[in-house]
Amino acid sequence: MAEKFDYVNKIWDIADYVRDTLSQAEYNKLVLPFVLLRRLENALEDTREDVLKALNEHETDWGLDNDNYCNASKRSFYNLSNFRLKTLGAIDTLNNFMAYINAFSPNVREIFENFDLENTATKLNKAGKLYEVCKKFGSFDFSPEAVSDRDMSDIYEHLIEKYGEAIAEGAEDFMTPKDIVRLAVGMIFANDDEIMNNDTGIVRTLCDPTAGTCGFITDALDLLEEWHKDKQMKAPAKIVPYGQECEGQSWAMGKVNLLLRNVAAKGKDKYDKRNDLSQHILLANTLTDDKFENMYFDYQLSNPPYGKKWEKEKDSVQEEAELGFKGRFGAGLPSISDGSMLFLQHVVAKMKPADEGGAKAGIVLSASPLFNGDPGSGPSTIRRWLFEKDIIDCIVKLGSGLFFRTSINTYLWILNNNKPNERKGKIQLIDASDIKTSMRKNRGKKNCEISEDQIAWIIKTYVDGHDHGKSVIVPVEDFMYRRVTTQRPLRMHMVIPESFEFKDDLPYLSQEGKNLVYGVVAKYIGDNPYKSALQLSKELKTTLAYTIDKLPKRQKSFFTPKNIVKWLFNNFGVIDSSYEAVDLKGNPIPENELRSYILINPQNIITDSNLRDYEDIPWDTDFDEYMQKEVLPFTPDAWIDKTDTDEKGSMPDHKIGTVGTKISFNQYFHNYEAPKSPIEIAKEIIQLEKELQSFEADFLK
């Protein structure tokens, strides 16, 4: 019957009716709460008289806010009013409407508060339209008999897509498409025999820290029911949902989704309808306010916003990061421009420990967390921490065009802190970027979907651990490397001509001091280049001692022999590759002895900072072998600076080179495209020239 109900056009008629009263940006504040209100009203209709009877008999003892009324409503919510949307009356409509809303149980009232329903109703009432709007919504049949839970969920999804532009504004995507949800849910439940087949009533927890409208949670529950449906179990596994959402209207939608769960199940309901599945869906910012502190979950699902800044949460996040691994963000902090790796760390922190059975999680991320950040940076160290914890089980590259509000490629990360032995120390990469089906009609930017068969193929590839053209299983070390610094000797001669000017002055000196410098430098015209620099630096410091002594401490510290030599080279040095390298005393090092000198005493060679370079050496690769093969054939006077060690980030090992991490799908799934032939390119150039000539002719007419 739900398919016959043309809710899109009928609700659009109502939006059109109020267009002079509410702006288009406010339609969501009308459409969404009124649809939810009508669904609640329909769900309570059968037990309304029982609730009013309980109120009459027990109001003195129970008051108005008491869960005992749920025994009469047979739901996890209730309403103590005689009103319906169709019976509010044309006179005093606003007061009657608010009395009706305030007669709901507290868990429903807080939902409507976050929709700012009273303000919307007041605007409609002032325009004389509230009564008609209530009557129109009151005529819709959203009863459990007419609209199933799944159909109602579809209605919500379409309404959010059409009217929910203002919800979670600024987030790239607050609603995860169902095909992505079903894939993620299928992957975290895969190979879990207890959740699929246990008939002893086990209870498992599922949390979404970026709950949005609770699409992940509701579809996880739907899938579990589908799988259990044909098994005729007496006590199948039960999921208790938890979640947090910081945007009020998204939270309200998600809260209602779970509050109304199974209202259409009748006698086949596998849950106690008086059990409020929405009770653990809380309104709070996950990054700044962990509502489930010291709690750990069996499963987690999350689709955090892509590229969303976390500057508003900065103080709170940094404060927790200072706790190290006693907090949620001990591994490191990502760039302020994208907080998705904070959510990734949060999910890991909330996984049930392996010694208690372990946990699995699915989180949808953009490409950035795979490779962003230099070695030692926050993002790189976060990945390193995940590798060392051996918690990444699989990453699936999804195709473009799968989400409603972004066309970028996304990646589904599957986390598991209790991997089977054969998968320990490894990560499976699945390239599903072309595993999708075109849709007949676009929904926003979503023009493709993953079919049920395609979802099954991806899950089977994951479960079986297939290593084929679309899947590889790789040791975590393949995603790690060390960035080492390479140095080369300074090859320079210093020319002090008979007539000279300084290119730059020694800082902080008075004119008198600069004149002293000029006089000292003039005495060294034509001397040995390096020895002159060393002798000059000493004499300058002696000559300027009185002047320098008068300077503030911070300025005084500039005048070291090293800085003065650098200043001399900046003014008089000439790079010349034909010159020999020299040691710190200015002695030349014969070219045939340079390599031996480098191996024995490289720290005594004057280096050229302009030739300093970096090499990313794969993990466990011998440094000397790498240099012999990749560097020395091209720069035979280079060496690795062994003083540059791994000191950055939250887990330094103090070894040579800074540890870096990156996960590159292109390394394993690169599709080679042969370049165009010269003949084909020549034809294209000729065609472009003809088009250009034609354009010029038309332009000059």
Which residues does each PLM region occupy?
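Short, contiguous acidic/charged loop-to-helix segments that flank catalytic cores in large enzymes
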Residues: T21, E311-E320, G324-D338, S368-G378, ...
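Conserved S-adenosyl-L-methionine
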Residues: G170, F174-S302, G307-K309, K314-E319, ...
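Feature representing long, continuous alpha-helical segments
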Residues: T218, A252, S302-P304, M341-A349, ...
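Short acidic (Asp/Glu) and glycine-rich catalytic loops that position anionic groups and cofactors
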Residues: C134-K135, G164, M233-P236, R274-L282, ...
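Non-catalytic, mostly N-terminal accessory regions of nucleic-acid modification and defense proteins
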Residues: M1-D193, K266-K270, L277-T286, K397-S400, ...
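Active-site lining segments that contact anionic ligands and/or coordinate catalytic metals
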Residues: Y296-F297, D338-S340, E356-S366, K389-D393, ...
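Conserved Class I SAM-dependent methyltransferase catalytic core
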Residues: Y17, E26-R39, G332-L415
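Flexible, glycine-/basic-rich loop-and-beta segments that form/coincide
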Residues: F404-D504
